[in-house]
Amino acid sequence: MTIKLNELIQKSKNLVFFTGAGISTNSGIPDFRGPQGIWKNSTPIYFQDFISSNDKRVESWERKFSNELSIDSAVPNTGHIKIAEIMKKKEESHLITQNVDNLHQNSGIQEKQITELHGNATYASCLDCNKRYELIDLKQDFLITKNPPSCNRCNGIIKTATISFGQAMPEAEMQLSQKKAIQSDLFICVGTSLAVFPAADLPVLAKETDAKLVICLLYTSDAADERLR
């Protein structure tokens, strides 16, 4: 960490971190849009296809249980741990993440300090009644039957607790993230391409409301570069 950034963090009273897939690559989880990203070699399954097609649900669960994203064995890296150390000293700080790997929680950050914009891939839930399911139980049944799981309470469709392409963003989480961005005096982006909307609007919102903006990443989209100038 540079001396300048450390000074900004020390002086900040409303620090917000905004993280994307790039922070987790050193934990063995590939990002999505980088040169070796997931979507270079795999096509995403859209939400409407998932709910309307049994075959697509089977494909989705096969991908999940093949550990495509290496989430099960991943542990927090130095980036996660450093952020956790900073946030432990700053109780008013907040973290907004696009990641679904649960590594920020595993690094020691309190749940109340984290907003997950794209959900969490370490468990599943019913799309109708929201009943939570642990993946280990679903995996055992799926490997035997090859049928996509359905809710034992309401017979609804079960899906990993993530936001898929074409699925509506969680309203409460978006509103809280926008509020935190507006209130921030220092907004630090780590490992995000700033290419996924509406989340990519958050650093712009922070900048427009006079927060100092810091971007720590290997690459951004051209559109993001232009909007943040």
Where are the regions that the model predicts?
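Conserved catalytic core of sirtuin-type NAD+-dependent deacylases
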Residues: 1-221
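Single conserved hydrophobic/aromatic residue that forms the stacking wall/gate
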Residues: 219-229
